[in-house]
């Protein structure tokens, strides 16, 4: 049931990471821990477990790709957003995958909102952007509760769009480019007739090295495992 639900729409988890050549950085603000309740700490531990399971599964299915760069947080946020539109067995399977089966949707949403807000404010020397959007085919009915909870808890941009228009992919690609500082300018070539809804998460990261290194000291070499 979960597989059928996921294939009925499209999930795009977009991750862009850019290195900085700028040696300057703002004065770091004092480090502070993210204050979590016991339940929220348990959810964070479960989220970490999901991240490793997700990475392991991707590695198994993408064996022909030597390098993988993925964001389990993006996947978790996408599935959490969709879970707000699910019921019955589909909802149970989604929360089981995320590791949040012992928590209500309200608890999951509140935790995700708190986590994202804390991450965005955690390090002033790092540029971090986390954005969500939902693109609905014009005329396709979506429950108001699904839209409102994703707007409120995930700060999602929700827009109805004429998927038959040749400009539709450009509009979605434009959102992606804007949220990744043009690191990923294109995610769609065309929109198939069967598409009804696109749910996107974009994560942009640009960090400053605490200890800079010279580019001239870096060269491509074969990577070897410990064994």
Positions of the model-derived regions?
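Post-signal peptide N-terminal segment of mature Sec-exported envelope proteins
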Residues: 27-47
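Non-catalytic, conformational "gating/processing" segments within enzyme and secreted inhibitor domains
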Residues: 65, 105-227
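Mature N-terminal segment immediately following signal peptide/propeptide cleavage
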Residues: 45-59
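Sec-dependent signal peptide recognition
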Residues: 2-8
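Bacterial signal peptide processing site
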Residues: 19-22
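C-terminal motif of bacterial Sec signal peptides marking the signal peptidase cleavage site
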Residues: 14-17
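Post-signal peptide N-terminal segment of secreted/secretory-pathway proteins
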Residues: 56-131
């Amino acid at each position: 049931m979960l597989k059928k639900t996921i294939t009925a729409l499209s999930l795009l988890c977009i991750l862009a990471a850019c290195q900085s050549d700028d040696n300057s950085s703002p004065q770091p603000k004092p480090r502070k821990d993210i204050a979590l309740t016991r339940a929220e700490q348990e959810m964070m531990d479960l989220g970490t477990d999901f991240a490793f399971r997700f990475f392991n599964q991707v590695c198994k299915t993408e064996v022909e790709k030597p390098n993988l760069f993925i964001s389990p947080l993006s996947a978790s946020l996408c599935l959490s957003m969709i879970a707000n539109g699910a019921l019955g067995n589909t909802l149970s399977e989604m929360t089981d995958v995320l590791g949040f089966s012992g928590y209500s949707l309200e608890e999951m949403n509140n935790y995700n909102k708190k986590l994202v807000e804390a991450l965005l404010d955690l390090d002033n020397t790092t540029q971090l952007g986390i954005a969500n959007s939902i693109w609905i085919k014009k005329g396709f009915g979506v429950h108001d509760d699904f839209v409102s909870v994703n707007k409120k808890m995930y700060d999602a941009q929700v827009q109805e769009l004429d998927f038959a228009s040749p400009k539709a992919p450009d509009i979605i690609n434009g959102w992606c480019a804007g949220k990744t500082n043009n690191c990923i300018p294109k995610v769609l070539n065309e929109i198939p007739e069967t598409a009804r809804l696109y749910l996107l998460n974009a994560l942009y990261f640009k960090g400053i090295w605490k200890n800079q290194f010279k580019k001239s000291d870096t060269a491509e070499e074969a990577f070897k495992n410990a064994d």
